[in-house]
C-alpha cells in the first residue's frame, strides 16, 4: 500500500468504528476467496460487513476513535466484522467459524464493552432483538385473546356455565 493511500484506509476504518457499535475481530488465514465471498454475502444480507485490515492502520483508527482497548487484538491476518445488530452478526460469524476452521474469532467490542471469544459465542446464543420483541408482544396479547375467546363463545355455552355455577350454590 502506498503511503498516500494509508490515510484514506485509516479514515475508512475510523468510519466503520464510528458507525458500527458492534465489531468482531477475526483471523482469516487459510480461507479461500469463495469462502470469504460467501461470508460477505451472508453478512450483507444482515446489514453487516467484513473487511480485511492492516493491523497498524486498524490500531491507528482504534486510537483515533477511543477504542484503545481493542488495539492489542490486531495481530496476524486480521479482518473485522461490523454491524449495528450484534446478536445477528455474532450468530453468523460463530456459525461460519464452526463450519470453517480457518476463521478464528479473536475478540470484539459491543457498545464499548470489550468481548473475548467466549463472550461472543455466548452472545450468539441470545435471541435477536426482533425475536425478543415478538415474544413480548405475544405474551402481552395472550391474556387478551383468552378473554375475547370466552366472550365470543356461543350464548348457550355461557348460559350453561352460569347455570352450573347457580346449581352449585
From Swiss-Prot:
Gene Ontology cellular component annotations, sorted alphabetically: large ribosomal subunit
Keyword Ribosomal protein among UniProt keywords: yes
UniProt keyword list: Ribonucleoprotein, Ribosomal protein, RNA-binding, rRNA-binding
One GO biological process term: translation
GO MF terms held by the record: large ribosomal subunit rRNA binding; structural constituent of ribosome
Keyword rRNA-binding in annotation: yes
Xref: Pfam families: Ribosomal_L10
Entries under Gene3D superfamilies matching the protein: 3.30.70.1730, 6.10.250.290
Residues spanning the membrane: none
Entry-linked CDD domains: Ribosomal_L10 (cd05797)
InterPro entries tied to this protein: Ribosomal_uL10, Ribosomal_uL10-like_sf, Ribosomal_uL10_bac, Ribosomal_uL10_bac_type, Ribosomal_uL10_CS_bac
PANTHER family in the cross-refs: 39S RIBOSOMAL PROTEIN L10, MITOCHONDRIAL (PTHR11560)
Complex formation: Part of the ribosomal stalk of the 50S ribosomal subunit. The N-terminus interacts with L11 and the large rRNA to form the base of the stalk. The C-terminus forms an elongated spine to which L12 dimers bind in a sequential fashion forming a multimeric L10(L12)X complex.
Protein purpose: Forms part of the ribosomal stalk, playing a central role in the interaction of the ribosome with GTP-bound translation factors.
Similarity comment text for this entry: Belongs to the universal ribosomal protein uL10 family.
Protein name: Large ribosomal subunit protein uL10
Species: Rickettsia massiliae (strain Mtu5)
Gene that this polypeptide is encoded by: rplJ
Amino acid at each position: 500500500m502506498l503511503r498516500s493511500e494509508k490515510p484514506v484506509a485509516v479514515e475508512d476504518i475510523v468510519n466503520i468504528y464510528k458507525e458500527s457499535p458492534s465489531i468482531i475481530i477475526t483471523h482469516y488465514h487459510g480461507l479461500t476467496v469463495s469462502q470469504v465471498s460467501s461470508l460477505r454475502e451472508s453478512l450483507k444480507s444482515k446489514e453487516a460487513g467484513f473487511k480485511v485490515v492492516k493491523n497498524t492502520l486498524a490500531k491507528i483508527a482504534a486510537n483515533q476513535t477511543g477504542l484503545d482497548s481493542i488495539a492489542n487484538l490486531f495481530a496476524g491476518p486480521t479482518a473485522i466484522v461490523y454491524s449495528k445488530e450484534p446478536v445477528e452478526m455474532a450468530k453468523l460469524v460463530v456459525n461460519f467459524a464452526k463450519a470453517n476452521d480457518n476463521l478464528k474469532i479473536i475478540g470484539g467490542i459491543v457498545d464499548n464493552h470489550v468481548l473475548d471469544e467466549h463472550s461472543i459465542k455466548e452472545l450468539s446464543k441470545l435471541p435477536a432483538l426482533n425475536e425478543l420483541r415478538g415474544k413480548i408482544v405475544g405474551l402481552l396479547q395472550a391474556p387478551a385473546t383468552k378473554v375475547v375467546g370466552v366472550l365470543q363463545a356461543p350464548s348457550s355455552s355461557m348460559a350453561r356455565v352460569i347455570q352450573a355455577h347457580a346449581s352449585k350454590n
